[in-house]
């Protein structure tokens, strides 16, 4: 699997509700490792730590699917978190009716992966998802 696709999969697994995800880590000797250490200590990478932090913060929060198509997936966790995944090669915008899907207004949602922020301030808010990336916003 492409490493970027793997990161998008981790964002989905650690962003959604339910369960206790298991993170695969591989410490094979160099002679046996066909992935050049890709999974060695993955649980200890800053990206994985941030995804796990999001997962733990959203524990017990409901999950509501907001939008999905061939490229993007957007869901929220209570009013405290939003996960957006874009698997295509260009930026995609997902516009949300914040009356239909409740969000906290006028406070920053901060992405744990990139430090990008989103502030909902009107009925229709567009989450712009960069190409081949995930966003895990939390209050």
Regions flagged by a language model, labelled:
Residues 1-139:
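Carbohydrate-interacting/catalytic domains
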